[in-house]
Amino acid sequence: MANLKDIRDRIVSVKNTRKITEAMRLVAAAKVRRAQEQVLRSRPFADRLARVLENIQSRMSFEMADAPLLKTSDLKTITLLAVTGDRGLCGGYNSNIIKRTEQRYAELNGQGYKVDLVLIGRKAITYFSNRSSQYTIRATFTGLEQVPTSDDAESITTEVLAEFLSQSTDRIEVIYTKFINLVSCNPVVQTLLPLDPQGIAEADDEIFRLTTKDSRLTVEKGVGPANEQPPLPSDIIFEQSPEQLLNALLPLYLQNQMLRALQESAASELASRMTAMNNASDNAKALAKTLTLDYNKARQAAITQEILEVVGGSCT
């Protein structure tokens, strides 16, 4: 009977666990839709802002070096900005970013560059802090909103801008999880600063589409929203000089790109958590069914044994 009790206790435990995972799945499913809509809503603004910047730069006669955020220099120090979550129970979401960061770190070290880390999310901070002898951590950020806000993006952008403008780093790359759909999210590496990618840039740069070509700002054609924005009028009149506008709008553009990376990461985390909890619920259901069968078999065997003992006793 002790065996029956153990099986019965396991069945109760598994069913209670399934209730928890099912509740977490429903919560993640409700949030991921909002996060997905937020990602899609933010894309037209960034696309239009990129085109405005291109229009402004087309009227400029000064060299790129006059815009600090467009300056390129000899690469010596590169900062990797890794975006993870504060919580677990989301499948391989956090571990995939950590693995990609380690891989990129090794690639750049192998090319002779000094590499620093800026970490977003408790999971990345915990992992790399435990290996502080191997990695140089410049800054950390935790406690961001589940639905990222412009304030979150501003605090991070302010930090990395200060590093770049003070020439503490020559290049900043962000490693985050690109949201594709509810079942597909990929960790990607994207160049954040400067806006002129060079040889070691990754090839899958799809979100940060503002770049430079022949010393002029251009907009790369890549994967974007389904609805294309209409072209800008060619006769726009700006009150300020192009130089003033460019230097004022570039930080806004970078902040917007940081916000979009955070938004895509948040949507990917929620989608991964929803998938993980759905799988956990299915596994709990299957396990409960198996345990119930085992319980019934054990109970039937116990009853049969008791009957045999009674029959055997009566015969003697």
Curated annotation (Swiss-Prot):
This protein's name: ATP synthase gamma chain
Q: Which UniProt keywords apply?
A: ATP synthesis, CF(1), Hydrogen ion transport, Ion transport, Membrane, Thylakoid, Transport
Superkingdom field: Bacteria
List locations, semicolon-separated. Cellular thylakoid membrane
Its GO CC terms are:
plasma membrane-derived thylakoid membrane; proton-transporting ATP synthase complex
Family according to the record: Belongs to the ATPase gamma chain family.
Q: Which SUPFAM superfamilies match?
A: ATP synthase (F1-ATPase), gamma subunit
Role description: Produces ATP from ADP in the presence of a proton gradient across the membrane. The gamma chain is believed to be important in regulating ATPase activity and the flow of protons through the CF(0) complex.
What does the record note on quaternary structure? F-type ATPases have 2 components, CF(1) - the catalytic core - and CF(0) - the membrane proton channel. CF(1) has five subunits: alpha(3), beta(3), gamma(1), delta(1), epsilon(1). CF(0) has three main subunits: a, b and c.
Topology of this chain in the membrane: Peripheral membrane protein
Write out the GO MF terms: ATP binding; proton-transporting ATP synthase activity, rotational mechanism
State which residue ranges cross the membrane. none
NCBIfam families given for it? ATPsyn_F1gamma, PRK05621.1-2
To which species is this protein native?
Answer: Prochlorococcus marinus (strain MIT 9313)
**InterPro entries in alphabetical order:** ATP_synth_F1_ATPase_gsu, ATP_synth_F1_gsu
